[in-house]
A protein has these predicted regions:
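Class I S-adenosyl-L-methionine-dependent methyltransferase catalytic core
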Residues: 1-64, 68, 81-206
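Intrinsic structural disorder/low-complexity segments
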Residues: 10, 73-75
């Protein structure tokens, strides 16, 4: 039997509890979709970490990533590696899902909720969806004294988030309009008039 301990330093910390193999089998697809959702206090906490990060060196930390996952995880889950099965397909295939559970238990990741165990194991097995870290973007902006950012492929929003905490103008372009609802929610939460998204090909923009 595999047991993991749930621990977190985020605001709204949940009580420590033990989970076992049966907990993995009780996970629903909605649990996978929502397991990185944060409270308003947790979103603020993550933004404050990014804002207070000096970015004198590029340490590659994950400040800002939880904020991005909160809004973009469903979109990330729509992506899959070439010739690899989608997590949704594995989830709805009893045989394949059992294999994923066994692989997850074997890796026995610590300090994670069960849905995240499964998500992280899938990423390790098939290759992860890359997020351009907001902390790295902040480092670059500061190093080159950026006063305005034109982002031709906005992606998941890390570069926009870095511009926000530095108080500089940002205009992002992306042709994937499936991302628009998530970006609209991010922009509403940030409430920053210096940030703008344009849903068109940057090469065709005027």
């Amino acid at each position: 039997m595999c047991a993991t301990t749930i621990q977190t330093n985020r605001p709204g910390k949940k009580p420590t509890q033990q989970t076992n193999m049966s907990d993995y089998r009780s996970i629903t697809w909605n649990d996978i979709l929502t397991h990185k959702q944060l409270s308003d206090d947790q979103l603020t906490w993550d933004l404050d970490r990014l804002r207070n990060y000096t970015a004198v060196t590029n340490r590659g930390n994950t400040f800002g990533n939880p904020f991005i996952y909160h809004y973009q995880l469903a979109n990330m889950l729509d992506c899959k590696r070439h010739n690899k099965k989608h997590l949704r397909d594995l989830f709805h295939d009893p045989v394949e899902y059992e294999r994923l559970i066994q692989s997850t238990i074997k890796k026995n990741r610590k300090n994670r909720i069960p849905a995240n165990d499964i998500f992280e194991c899938y990423r390790m097995n098939t290759g992860s969806i890359s997020v351009f870290k907001a902390s790295t973007a902040k480092y670059i902006y500061k190093k080159y004294s950026a006063g305005r950012v034109l982002d031709p492929t906005a992606g998941w929003g890390g570069r926009m988030l870095a511009a926000h905490v530095l108080g500089i103008e940002y205009t992002g372009f992306d042709t994937n309009t499936n991302l628009k609802p998530a970006y609209d929610s991010m922009l509403s939460r940030l409430n920053d008039s210096r940030l703008a998204m344009r849903w068109e090909d940057c090469l065709q923009a005027e």
